[in-house]
Protein backbone atom coordinates (compact mmCIF):
# COMPACT_ATOMS: atom_id res chain seq x y z
CA UNK A 1 0.00 0.00 0.00
CA UNK A 2 1.29 3.46 -0.90
CA UNK A 3 2.21 5.70 2.00
CA UNK A 4 1.50 9.41 2.29
CA UNK A 5 5.22 10.10 1.76
CA UNK A 6 5.19 8.51 -1.68
CA UNK A 7 4.19 10.69 -4.64
CA UNK A 8 0.80 9.84 -6.07
CA UNK A 9 0.61 7.93 -9.30
CA UNK A 10 -1.53 9.75 -11.86
CA UNK A 11 -3.47 7.87 -14.52
CA UNK A 12 -4.22 10.24 -17.41
CA UNK A 13 -7.22 9.41 -19.59
CA UNK A 14 -7.17 10.72 -23.17
CA UNK A 15 -9.94 10.30 -25.75
CA UNK A 16 -9.01 11.29 -29.30
CA UNK A 17 -11.16 12.03 -32.33
CA UNK A 18 -9.84 13.81 -35.43
CA UNK A 19 -7.51 15.86 -33.24
CA UNK A 20 -4.29 15.60 -35.23
CA UNK A 21 -3.96 19.37 -35.58
CA UNK A 22 -3.39 19.90 -31.85
CA UNK A 23 -2.41 16.54 -30.33
CA UNK A 24 1.35 17.05 -30.47
CA UNK A 25 1.10 20.16 -28.25
CA UNK A 26 -0.97 18.32 -25.66
CA UNK A 27 1.31 15.29 -25.57
CA UNK A 28 4.38 17.50 -25.23
CA UNK A 29 2.75 19.24 -22.27
CA UNK A 30 2.30 15.87 -20.56
CA UNK A 31 6.02 15.21 -20.87
CA UNK A 32 6.73 18.65 -19.37
CA UNK A 33 4.80 18.00 -16.14
CA UNK A 34 6.77 18.56 -12.94
CA UNK A 35 4.96 15.57 -11.41
CA UNK A 36 6.76 12.71 -13.16
CA UNK A 37 4.80 9.67 -11.95
CA UNK A 38 2.08 9.36 -14.56
CA UNK A 39 0.85 6.90 -17.13
CA UNK A 40 -1.43 7.52 -20.09
CA UNK A 41 -4.39 5.35 -21.09
CA UNK A 42 -6.02 6.43 -24.32
CA UNK A 43 -8.72 5.50 -26.78
CA UNK A 44 -9.39 6.70 -30.32
CA UNK A 45 -13.03 7.26 -31.27
CA UNK A 46 -12.79 6.33 -34.94
CA UNK A 47 -10.65 9.21 -36.22
CA UNK A 48 -10.30 9.76 -39.95
CA UNK A 49 -7.03 11.67 -39.53
CA UNK A 50 -3.62 10.80 -38.02
CA UNK A 51 -4.69 11.11 -34.38
CA UNK A 52 -4.08 7.46 -33.49
CA UNK A 53 -0.73 7.40 -35.27
CA UNK A 54 0.41 10.53 -33.41
CA UNK A 55 -0.39 9.03 -30.01
CA UNK A 56 1.17 5.70 -30.98
CA UNK A 57 4.37 7.46 -32.04
CA UNK A 58 4.37 9.25 -28.68
CA UNK A 59 3.88 5.90 -26.93
CA UNK A 60 6.82 4.38 -28.79
CA UNK A 61 9.11 7.04 -27.33
CA UNK A 62 8.02 6.38 -23.73
CA UNK A 63 9.13 3.70 -21.30
CA UNK A 64 7.41 0.37 -21.74
CA UNK A 65 4.00 0.32 -20.07
CA UNK A 66 3.75 4.08 -19.62
CA UNK A 67 1.22 4.47 -22.44
CA UNK A 68 -1.60 1.99 -23.05
CA UNK A 69 -4.29 1.96 -25.71
CA UNK A 70 -7.84 0.81 -24.97
CA UNK A 71 -9.34 -0.78 -28.06
CA UNK A 72 -12.94 -1.11 -26.87
CA UNK A 73 -15.64 -0.10 -27.38
CA UNK A 74 -15.03 -0.10 -31.13
CA UNK A 75 -16.14 2.66 -33.46
CA UNK A 76 -17.45 6.13 -32.71
CA UNK A 77 -19.25 6.38 -29.38
CA UNK A 78 -18.71 10.05 -28.54
CA UNK A 79 -16.54 11.91 -26.07
CA UNK A 80 -18.50 11.20 -22.90
CA UNK A 81 -18.91 7.47 -23.51
CA UNK A 82 -15.25 7.19 -24.50
CA UNK A 83 -14.00 8.83 -21.32
CA UNK A 84 -16.31 6.75 -19.13
CA UNK A 85 -15.09 3.57 -20.85
CA UNK A 86 -11.52 4.60 -20.05
CA UNK A 87 -12.44 5.36 -16.45
CA UNK A 88 -14.12 1.98 -15.97
CA UNK A 89 -11.08 0.26 -17.43
CA UNK A 90 -8.60 1.81 -14.99
CA UNK A 91 -10.72 2.22 -11.84
CA UNK A 92 -10.25 -1.21 -10.27
CA UNK A 93 -6.48 -1.06 -10.71
CA UNK A 94 -6.07 2.20 -8.82
CA UNK A 95 -4.14 2.20 -5.56
CA UNK A 96 -5.32 4.13 -2.48
CA UNK A 97 -3.18 7.17 -3.28
CA UNK A 98 -3.65 7.13 -7.05
CA UNK A 99 -5.58 9.80 -8.93
CA UNK A 100 -7.20 9.98 -12.36
CA UNK A 101 -7.00 13.01 -14.67
CA UNK A 102 -9.07 13.70 -17.78
CA UNK A 103 -7.12 15.11 -20.75
CA UNK A 104 -8.66 16.75 -23.81
CA UNK A 105 -6.80 16.31 -27.09
CA UNK A 106 -6.58 19.97 -28.05
CA UNK A 107 -5.37 21.72 -24.89
CA UNK A 108 -1.97 22.42 -23.36
CA UNK A 109 -1.29 21.65 -19.72
CA UNK A 110 0.85 24.08 -17.75
CA UNK A 111 3.82 22.29 -16.11
CA UNK A 112 2.33 22.38 -12.60
CA UNK A 113 -1.11 21.10 -13.61
CA UNK A 114 -0.76 17.62 -12.14
CA UNK A 115 1.27 18.60 -9.10
CA UNK A 116 -1.33 21.14 -7.94
CA UNK A 117 -4.12 18.60 -8.30
CA UNK A 118 -2.16 15.89 -6.52
CA UNK A 119 -1.27 18.22 -3.65
CA UNK A 120 -4.88 19.38 -3.23
CA UNK A 121 -6.31 15.86 -3.22
CA UNK A 122 -3.59 14.51 -0.92
CA UNK A 123 -4.75 16.88 1.83
CA UNK A 124 -8.12 15.09 2.04
CA UNK A 125 -9.02 11.69 3.52
CA UNK A 126 -8.50 9.00 0.91
CA UNK A 127 -11.67 7.10 1.73
CA UNK A 128 -13.97 10.02 0.80
CA UNK A 129 -14.60 10.82 -2.88
CA UNK A 130 -13.06 14.08 -4.03
CA UNK A 131 -12.84 15.86 -7.36
CA UNK A 132 -10.49 18.71 -8.28
CA UNK A 133 -11.03 21.30 -11.00
CA UNK A 134 -9.29 24.56 -11.81
CA UNK A 135 -9.57 27.74 -13.81
CA UNK A 136 -8.26 27.86 -17.36
CA UNK A 137 -6.51 30.33 -19.63
CA UNK A 138 -8.80 30.52 -22.65
CA UNK A 139 -6.78 30.69 -25.86
CA UNK A 140 -7.47 30.61 -29.58
CA UNK A 141 -6.35 27.89 -31.97
CA UNK A 142 -2.84 29.39 -32.06
CA UNK A 143 -2.61 29.62 -28.25
CA UNK A 144 -3.08 33.39 -28.18
CA UNK A 145 -4.68 34.38 -24.89
CA UNK A 146 -8.33 35.41 -24.99
CA UNK A 147 -9.20 35.59 -21.30
CA UNK A 148 -9.22 33.61 -18.06
CA UNK A 149 -12.23 31.56 -17.04
CA UNK A 150 -14.29 33.26 -14.31
CA UNK A 151 -13.92 32.62 -10.60
CA UNK A 152 -16.68 30.68 -8.91
CA UNK A 153 -18.89 32.94 -6.81
CA UNK A 154 -20.91 30.13 -5.17
CA UNK A 155 -19.26 27.07 -3.56
CA UNK A 156 -19.85 24.03 -5.81
CA UNK A 157 -22.09 21.51 -4.07
CA UNK A 158 -25.29 19.55 -4.48
CA UNK A 159 -28.00 20.45 -5.53
CA UNK A 160 -26.32 23.33 -7.38
CA UNK A 161 -24.52 20.68 -9.43
CA UNK A 162 -27.90 19.84 -11.01
CA UNK A 163 -28.19 23.32 -12.50
CA UNK A 164 -24.85 23.60 -14.34
CA UNK A 165 -21.47 21.96 -14.75
CA UNK A 166 -18.60 23.68 -12.94
CA UNK A 167 -16.04 20.91 -13.46
CA UNK A 168 -14.20 21.68 -16.68
CA UNK A 169 -13.11 18.29 -17.99
CA UNK A 170 -9.61 19.28 -19.09
CA UNK A 171 -8.79 20.23 -15.48
CA UNK A 172 -10.64 17.44 -13.64
CA UNK A 173 -8.67 15.11 -11.39
CA UNK A 174 -10.29 12.57 -9.04
CA UNK A 175 -9.03 10.48 -6.17
CA UNK A 176 -9.47 6.71 -6.09
CA UNK A 177 -12.77 6.87 -4.20
CA UNK A 178 -14.32 9.31 -6.67
CA UNK A 179 -13.02 7.44 -9.71
CA UNK A 180 -14.48 4.16 -8.49
CA UNK A 181 -17.77 5.83 -7.56
CA UNK A 182 -18.20 7.29 -11.05
CA UNK A 183 -16.93 4.17 -12.80
CA UNK A 184 -19.49 2.03 -10.99
CA UNK A 185 -22.41 4.31 -11.86
CA UNK A 186 -24.61 4.69 -14.93
CA UNK A 187 -24.48 8.14 -16.51
CA UNK A 188 -27.60 9.45 -18.27
CA UNK A 189 -27.47 9.43 -22.09
CA UNK A 190 -25.76 12.49 -23.52
CA UNK A 191 -24.44 13.79 -20.19
CA UNK A 192 -20.83 14.89 -20.43
CA UNK A 193 -18.40 12.82 -18.38
CA UNK A 194 -17.11 15.80 -16.39
CA UNK A 195 -20.59 17.00 -15.42
CA UNK A 196 -21.66 13.51 -14.38
CA UNK A 197 -18.53 13.10 -12.25
CA UNK A 198 -19.13 16.48 -10.57
CA UNK A 199 -22.84 15.79 -10.08
CA UNK A 200 -22.45 12.30 -8.65
CA UNK A 201 -19.51 13.08 -6.38
CA UNK A 202 -21.27 16.08 -4.82
CA UNK A 203 -24.57 14.17 -4.46
CA UNK A 204 -22.66 11.35 -2.74
CA UNK A 205 -21.26 13.77 -0.17
CA UNK A 206 -17.82 14.09 -1.75
CA UNK A 207 -15.64 17.17 -1.87
CA UNK A 208 -15.22 19.49 -4.84
CA UNK A 209 -11.96 21.44 -4.84
CA UNK A 210 -11.95 24.57 -6.99
CA UNK A 211 -8.43 25.86 -7.71
CA UNK A 212 -8.32 29.56 -8.59
CA UNK A 213 -4.95 29.14 -10.30
CA UNK A 214 -5.32 28.47 -14.05
CA UNK A 215 -3.59 25.20 -14.96
CA UNK A 216 -4.53 24.64 -18.61
CA UNK A 217 -4.42 26.54 -21.88
CA UNK A 218 -7.97 25.75 -23.01
CA UNK A 219 -8.24 26.05 -26.78
CA UNK A 220 -11.42 27.63 -28.16
CA UNK A 221 -11.97 26.65 -31.77
CA UNK A 222 -14.69 25.44 -34.09
CA UNK A 223 -14.14 21.74 -33.39
CA UNK A 224 -14.33 21.71 -29.58
CA UNK A 225 -16.64 19.01 -28.25
CA UNK A 226 -17.64 21.58 -25.62
CA UNK A 227 -16.41 25.16 -25.51
CA UNK A 228 -16.09 27.56 -22.60
CA UNK A 229 -18.06 30.83 -22.51
CA UNK A 230 -15.79 33.63 -21.34
CA UNK A 231 -18.15 34.81 -18.62
CA UNK A 232 -21.10 33.60 -16.60
CA UNK A 233 -23.18 36.47 -18.05
CA UNK A 234 -22.66 34.98 -21.50
CA UNK A 235 -23.71 31.60 -20.15
CA UNK A 236 -26.92 33.13 -18.86
CA UNK A 237 -27.59 34.80 -22.20
CA UNK A 238 -26.90 31.55 -24.05
CA UNK A 239 -29.34 29.71 -21.78
CA UNK A 240 -31.98 32.39 -22.36
CA UNK A 241 -31.68 32.01 -26.13
CA UNK A 242 -31.97 28.21 -25.95
CA UNK A 243 -35.25 28.37 -24.07
CA UNK A 244 -36.52 26.11 -21.29
CA UNK A 245 -36.97 22.90 -23.31
CA UNK A 246 -33.34 21.82 -23.57
CA UNK A 247 -32.37 22.93 -20.07
CA UNK A 248 -35.32 21.31 -18.33
CA UNK A 249 -34.88 18.15 -20.38
CA UNK A 250 -31.30 17.84 -19.14
CA UNK A 251 -32.34 18.62 -15.56
CA UNK A 252 -35.05 15.95 -15.59
CA UNK A 253 -32.68 13.42 -17.11
CA UNK A 254 -30.03 14.05 -14.45
CA UNK A 255 -32.60 13.90 -11.66
CA UNK A 256 -33.87 10.56 -12.99
CA UNK A 257 -30.34 9.16 -13.26
CA UNK A 258 -29.58 10.05 -9.64
CA UNK A 259 -32.93 8.69 -8.47
CA UNK A 260 -32.15 5.36 -10.13
CA UNK A 261 -28.94 5.18 -8.06
CA UNK A 262 -30.22 6.54 -4.76
CA UNK A 263 -28.08 4.10 -2.80
CA UNK A 264 -25.02 6.14 -3.81
CA UNK A 265 -26.39 9.43 -2.42
CA UNK A 266 -26.31 10.92 1.05
CA UNK A 267 -29.59 11.00 3.03
CA UNK A 268 -29.68 14.80 2.65
CA UNK A 269 -29.20 14.58 -1.12
CA UNK A 270 -31.98 11.99 -1.36
CA UNK A 271 -34.38 14.30 0.47
CA UNK A 272 -33.42 17.24 -1.74
CA UNK A 273 -33.85 15.10 -4.83
CA UNK A 274 -37.31 14.00 -3.69
CA UNK A 275 -38.38 17.62 -3.21
CA UNK A 276 -37.13 18.53 -6.68
CA UNK A 277 -38.96 15.54 -8.17
CA UNK A 278 -42.22 16.57 -6.47
CA UNK A 279 -41.76 20.09 -7.80
CA UNK A 280 -41.18 18.89 -11.35
CA UNK A 281 -44.38 16.82 -11.17
CA UNK A 282 -46.37 19.56 -9.46
CA UNK A 283 -47.51 23.10 -9.99
CA UNK A 284 -46.17 26.60 -9.26
CA UNK A 285 -46.36 26.38 -5.46
CA UNK A 286 -44.24 23.23 -5.28
CA UNK A 287 -41.75 24.69 -7.73
CA UNK A 288 -41.46 27.91 -5.73
CA UNK A 289 -40.85 25.85 -2.60
CA UNK A 290 -38.12 23.83 -4.33
CA UNK A 291 -36.39 27.02 -5.44
CA UNK A 292 -35.89 27.85 -1.76
CA UNK A 293 -33.73 24.75 -1.29
CA UNK A 294 -30.29 25.82 -0.02
CA UNK A 295 -27.81 25.62 -2.86
CA UNK A 296 -30.27 25.11 -5.73
CA UNK A 297 -28.84 27.93 -7.80
CA UNK A 298 -26.46 28.89 -10.55
CA UNK A 299 -23.35 31.02 -10.21
CA UNK A 300 -24.49 34.59 -11.01
CA UNK A 301 -27.66 36.62 -10.66
CA UNK A 302 -28.17 36.61 -14.45
CA UNK A 303 -27.86 32.83 -14.67
CA UNK A 304 -29.99 32.43 -11.56
CA UNK A 305 -32.82 34.55 -12.96
CA UNK A 306 -32.88 32.46 -16.14
CA UNK A 307 -32.78 29.25 -14.11
CA UNK A 308 -35.68 30.34 -11.90
CA UNK A 309 -37.75 31.28 -14.95
CA UNK A 310 -37.09 27.98 -16.73
CA UNK A 311 -37.74 25.97 -13.56
CA UNK A 312 -41.11 27.64 -13.09
CA UNK A 313 -42.38 27.30 -16.67
CA UNK A 314 -40.42 24.40 -18.16
List each language-model region with its residue ranges:
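C-terminal subregions of glycosyltransferases and related glycan-biosynthesis enzymes
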Residues: 190, 195-196, 217-314
